[in-house]
Amino acid sequence: MSLPEPLRRRLGSFSRTVFTDSRRAGPQYPSERADNEILSSLPLQMSLYFNVYFFPFWWLSTVFMLQLKYPVLSDYYKFILVTVMILTSLIEVIRLYLGYMGNLQEKVPELAGFWLLTLLLQLPVILFLLFNEGLNIQPLERSVNIIFALFLVFQVIAAFVTLKRMVNKLATHFHLNEFDRLEEHPVRHLYGPSKEENVLPMASMGPC
């Protein structure tokens, strides 16, 4: 299972725009070492691993507390909490899948999708659950939401750093491949014929 090709292209273009370091003139390492460099982030992968086991505990805790306080909530907050639980569950499954695929297989579009889902959707939702006192927040809820928020903040930072490394390596490889191609097939007469080529035909004509 992979992302649709149009979405992959859009995420790839977004990554090149946001994460490319324009100040970087070339690779920091020799080409052989750069080719063998592992770009996957171990801290990010460990965070995703523990997140996979933590999320069911968070879900069960949140559903249990929602059931207990449901009668005292207003209809407005009842609707919001049920909607948030459904959306958070769906987003988290997709988010963790993209994180695993993007980090382990060094796929930029998948990791960019993971980063965007974490930053723009999941983190704001968890902060809403953590700080909105109208939800009648219980101690267990606050505890699991704080842990979840810490996971998300760390993953946003770690994924950002990893994406910058991946995109810059891809950009470096692209420029090196272009340079090698020009060396193998040099573009001659780029600015017109050289002086020697202009002089030789004139000399070969001789006097009339």
UniProtKB/Swiss-Prot annotation:
The keyword Transmembrane applies. Pfam families: Transmemb_17. It is found in: Cell projection, Cilium membrane. One of its GO terms (cellular component) is MKS complex. Belongs to the TMEM17 family. Transmembrane component of the tectonic-like complex, a complex localized at the transition zone of primary cilia and acting as a barrier that prevents diffusion of transmembrane proteins between the cilia and plasma membranes. Required for ciliogenesis and sonic hedgehog/SHH signaling. Part of the tectonic-like complex (also named B9 complex). This is Transmembrane protein 17. It comes from Gallus gallus. The gene is TMEM17.
